[in-house]
Amino acid sequence: MSDDYKAYLERAQRTLRQPVDAIFERIRAIIGPANMPSSEQGRLAQQALDAMRAMQRPSPQQLAALEYVIRLMRPAPLSRSGSLDTLDRDFSDIFTDWKTFQESVKPYLYSVGRIDSLSTRKSVGTGFLVAETLLATNRHVLDQLSCGTNELEQGQAVVRFGQEHSTPDTLGIVNILRVVALHDSLDMALLEIEKPNDATPAEPLTVETSAARDGDAVVAVGYPFDDPTRNPLFIQALFGGKFGVKRAAPGEVVKISAQSVFHDCSTLGGNSGSPIFSMKTARVVGIHRDGFFMFRNEAVDGASLAQFIDQHV
């Protein structure tokens, strides 16, 4: 069996510590029977595990089912009043550093904001502070904000750092003033914003230049929104129907390649531009840029992001 399959098996075993049938029962209790995948998916996933443990190659259908089950074990806790929700025991047993991360990330949660277009009155993505008035996001987020011109004027867009579920946004809106820089080849942009008011406890995020490693626990923080045309049914239940508000999404690094970090956090549309934190250090190891739910999620790596920021600070 190839090293890739061995790594996949290790990832699956870190997540699925019981037979798949037992995992399905736990998930059914969380999201309800109507939102569950078919029992056939569970059978195929168990076959994939059994095959890899026997040093055999599973079929593509079996692997797809196994990936589906792994993603069922990737929660999306809410941020409330500047703190992340505690994970249910079913998930905290997987992400053993979560409690420490809840504390270490607190100074940075109000530095992650939802980017809204004032012309369309829609949110288009996520951004985060890398300096007092400098916001990092994706180039394609800027493309949506600027209608493809890659230029912004005051009054076109704002960022909201306090948009949380069931918590009044006392921080208000912050105007985005202009485009500072676009990366030539990577999906990154830097935007200048107004200085957040003194009531905003905003601390610029620290970017890690050392490469993340396969299997590292990571967390995407951003503002996922609903997309009924792309999201499976269980997403509505897993997210409790609450979209467009600040959430964390724990997962792990699946693969590292040149200037990219592939991860399996539960990111949706709206997470574009989200910081990918190391769960151990609360440092940013990437900026989320793209994803296909249940297939792959991709971020630009921290070293490339740090170099880009250094050129413009």
Where are these regions (language model features)?
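Short, solvent-exposed coil/turn linker segments
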Residues: 83, 87-98, 208-212, 274, ...
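C-terminal subregion of chymotrypsin/trypsin-like serine protease catalytic domains
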Residues: 2-18, 22, 26, 33, ...
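Weak global preference for isoleucine
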Residues: 23, 27-31, 70, 94, ...
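Serine endopeptidase catalytic core focused on the charge-relay Asp
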Residues: 103-124, 128-269, 277-280, 297-303
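Protease-domain processing segments flanking chymotrypsin-fold serine proteases, especially trypsin-like
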Residues: 1-125, 245-248
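Residue-identity detector for glutamine
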Residues: 13, 18, 41, 46-47, ...
